[in-house]
Amino acid sequence: MKRIMYLLSLLSITMFACNISSTATPAVVTTSGVTATIPVPSEPPTASEPLQATGTPLPMTNTTCNEMSLFLDPALASGFNCQTVPEAGDPNAPGFDINPKYTEIKLTGYILSDRFFTPVIDVYPVERFSELLPEVIPTKLAALQALTAGGPTGSKGLPFLPNFNASQEFFAMYQVLPFTSGNGIRFLTQYSQFADPINNHEIFYTYQGQTPDGKYWVSAILPVSNPLLPADGKNPPNGQSWDAFNNNFTTYIAALAAQLNAQPPESYSPTIPMLDALVASITIH
């Protein structure tokens, strides 16, 4: 109960976070199922190989939502909802409540259920987002461009959209990864408003990419799990007290990130190659 009250008290924090629209304008939603089974390439493109040079053709896309198309493996999700999320641009709203009009694919029948995050893939118009948040979006765009050009990751977190009212606790399994219409980065992460154990309920795979012209930003949030992690973050690891866990959080995160980096990509569910293949197939029209 103490942790719940603490969490509730932090909901007023004005850190940029969950991009939850406060507008009364409803999103336009279209629902569809995956009707074609097309083999996914066994190996996704790597950071050192441009997508067109891998020699392994991507499957034909079987999922389209507005300007975005991709190949959705039926083994990963059985269907999807396509929606156009309306703009939320109240200048008096916190940054995590501000967004341009954008396209979202929400996966249904996903291989993992009852996770903190819903599996989604979003496409944001960069110019309008930058107009709405001029002190935030250009900085994130520059950071993403530096990483895709081969720059170091540093230790202050990786560029990420949507904006959350929580902090990026860690990242692991980082890689530069091209997609059909651009380039980006993928990594595992977890967000929280307090020192929270990394766990299978909250951890997710994310892809953050951009088109070469800088017009669109692609963001994917896809839950994952690994046998190394606990089911949830209700208790600190190894029987510690919360005070002890908080005091040693930096050491804990560094050690856990190293352990996750050492796990085989196929040990995750869904596997990292399966998720890489999904985001690599994204095409922006």
Tell what function each PLM region has.
Residues 24, 111, 129, 193, ...:
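Residues that cap or initiate secondary-structure elements
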